[in-house]
Amino acid sequence: MKIAVIGQSLFGQEVYCHLRKEGHEVVGVFTVPDKDGKADPLGLEAEKDGVPVFKYSRWRAKGQALPDVVAKYQALGAELNVLPFCSQFIPMEIISAPRHGSIIYHPSLLPRHRGASAINWTLIHGDKKGGFSIFWADDGLDTGDLLLQKECEVLPDDTVSTLYNRFLFPEGIKGMVQAVRLIAEGKAPRLPQPEEGATYEGIQKKETAKINWDQPAEAIHNWIRGNDKVPGAWTEACEQKLTFFNSTLNTSGLVPEGDALPIPGAHRPGVVTKAGLILFGNDDKMLLVKNIQLEDGKMILASNFFKGAASSVLELTEAELVTAEAVRSVWQRILPKVLEVEDSTDFFKSGAASVDVVRLVEEVKELCDGLELENEDVYMASTFGDFIQLLVRKLRGDDEEGECSIDYVEMAVNKRTVRMPHQLFIGGEFVDAEGAKTSETINPTDGSVICQVSLAQVTDVDKAVAAAKDAFENGRWGKISARDRGRLMYRLADLMEQHQEELATIEALDAGAVYTLALKTHVGMSIQTFRYFAGWCDKIQGSTIPINQARPNRNLTLTRKEPVGVCGIIIPWNYPLMMLSWKTAACLAAGNTVVIKPAQVTPLTALKFAELTLKAGIPKGVVNVLPGSGSLVGQRLSDHPDVRKIGFTGSTEVGKHIMKSCAISNVKKVSLELGGKSPLIIFADCDLNKAVQMGMSSVFFNKGENCIAAGRLFVEDSIHDEFVRRVVEEVRKMKVGNPLDRDTDHGPQNHHAHLVKLMEYCQHGVKEGATLVCGGNQVPRPGFFFEPTVFTDVEDHMFIAKEESFGPVMIISRFADGDLDAVLSRANATEFGLASGVFTRDINKALYVSDKLQAGTVFVNTYNKTDVAAPFGGFKQSGFGKDLGEAALNEYLRVKTVTFEY
């Protein structure tokens, strides 16, 4: 058909393009005149195609159609007029001229909401159903016969923009094309509009959009969302006109803490909170507004209403200045009437419209590859200077999400100044615990107090879980792409690397870790872990599955891997940062949010990590850190109904209790890495030098505070005495001392209670008849130092043969030469199964032993060789679930099956 398109906007442009793709001939386009030198998108598109474009400011004069306009229209020979979006009054001489007449798109379910602000009134009235109508134009106001209608559900927090973008725009384009197709096929109906239910409302303007506070909260919410963006619902407060945007109903019934905002005429003062502005209806129910436009036109976060201009002005680098000038050129192209774009140039006051916002965002994103920029950012920073500041903060990963006031504890140590946060980290802020509760964290090197650390209470856990839940369900974390999530994790790993000396120093101070080992392992492997899982973010995928078809129809079945939600991670004290990283990296890569409970005795690197997440741009609430006791914080996380997964590393006894709590509370998913008594079998045909070296490492690595430490060494009889002699010789060479000294081999045990348990453990071994070859006592110096210890003649029934020391205690037992199956039986005669090892030159023996050992990891001619890509986790009462490797992702994902029939 020959079609004349009459209208404007991106919607009109899309309808025009789709009609041409359908094979229709668009003989002419009638649109609005250029505004401030900018042509409407519909006209621009048609001009590119060589289609005649007419830009009339009016079609009539004194109630009569302009003859020249009518003549030019009639010369086109159109068979149908299509009006996808038209703000002008078109004379009936034009409307009725074509053979098929004219069809009009209207964004409501006619006869309801006739008039120019139909979408606004759909929301203002709280309609549960919305949609659009395509009708045959007549001489009435939206009263013509219906050709086609489509409806959708109106969501409780829909705004004009969300409803338009989700349904009215994409489905409306399809609807217009379908309507034209029906006309071309001679199948288009003409259904008279019913009079029942017909309404007409006037156009919404700024002067009519003032909020009436004497109505329920839901009605106020509907008024605000119905006027969202244009014209904007407003009120007077603080001696200025405030316009509210982005409203949601608050159904929790709890009024958050905040600052009162008196509003004349309101039932109660508003409350400015961290989440936004709480408003009240006359029914005492609440709604939350997230954005406020001030009288000068500046848009701010409602939560910042009383903060003023809180952000300092950034000094731009040379590269950033180049980017700023490139962005200035983009502004100049969009704002041709502005002679020179200056820092004070306001995008909207210079004539920009909403379509220009889209163009600006897309051009800047193309200019700055990987940038996360949304339309809302332009409204929040409408002057060029503010926009550049916002842009640079985002590019640095130091935007608003990263701004936080931190009360540091500073110490001059290890030839540097370390700065350590010491408060709880909840919702992106460092805060005191409920009741200002604190506990001391102790330096195990000398027993001195490092600082007071906030001690989380049950109410703090609830706040942290609520922050994590909100970040997961409503925050930016769940909206960004998986690739962008990976980019943030890479940035976090880079920051950890930049701060690795500081992190390693804190590990030495707080946990007694030998500094050189902390650099390589505690911190180094943590960095590797985040980089490894950052790479997995955009590779988490489901599969398609062939199933039996429901003949004569067909089926398609697919699976999706989804994050589980809020996760609680409870970490031990032996590797404070590394254990955090092993679990948290996989958890975040899967798209979850997290509440981390570090061990009460070693909280400081976890809190430093929290600070780095802010600097990396991880959105607020995604990561929360709660130092505190296991009986309070760990228990509440296990019991909390909004926590969907617990990852725990610690003792078997506590792991059993956590598993029970997870089952009783809400059957939450759980993974447990628990105790161990890992056997290491050393055969006579081994490389003895290597066996001694690795045997030492298997026990004394990280002062023996190592979950996979070899809890018992089985040495073949013919090399037993020589092995023991060499081990004792090496032990006597070990330097026990300050973990910050570069030549120290062996630092202090983690805390005093653990030191006491080690002494009791050794006393137990001596009482039962084991031979104490060396060590077994506290080192006579300040701090929690324990001598590297070696026991021999350990029999299977003894306490030290069965129980884990979790310290620098080597337990050696003999086995008869060639008695392979007997030693395997003894090695497996434990309820633990975390790790194991074997030293032999015989590959057949190595393979046989690795098959038979009942442990999650078997080391052959090595020990402690973990890697971020290799799954880690135990069997039996050493727990279940995996850290590291691809397998770890499954601990933090759920699989959904979706089946289609067609």
From Swiss-Prot:
Residues 318-395 form the Carrier domain. Homotetramer. Keywords: Acetylation, Cytoplasm, NADP, One-carbon metabolism, Oxidoreductase, Phosphopantetheine, Phosphoprotein. Its main location: cytoplasm. The gene is ALDH1L1. GO terms for biological process: 10-formyltetrahydrofolate catabolic process; biosynthetic process; NADPH regeneration; tetrahydrofolate interconversion. The modification N6-succinyllysine is found at K38, K660, K767. Cytosolic 10-formyltetrahydrofolate dehydrogenase that catalyzes the NADP(+)-dependent conversion of 10-formyltetrahydrofolate to tetrahydrofolate and carbon dioxide. May also have an NADP(+)-dependent aldehyde dehydrogenase activity towards formaldehyde, acetaldehyde, propionaldehyde, and benzaldehyde. It comes from Homo sapiens. The modification Phosphoserine is found at S9, S629, S631, S825. Coiled coil: none annotated. The keyword Acetylation applies. InterPro entries: 10_FTHF_DH, ACP-like_sf, Ald_DH/histidinol_DH, Ald_DH_C, Ald_DH_CS_CYS, Ald_DH_CS_GLU, Ald_DH_N, Aldehyde_DH_dom. Pfam families: Aldedh (PF00171), Formyl_trans_C (PF02911), Formyl_trans_N (PF00551), PP-binding (PF00550). Highly expressed in liver, pancreas and kidney. This is Cytosolic 10-formyltetrahydrofolate dehydrogenase.
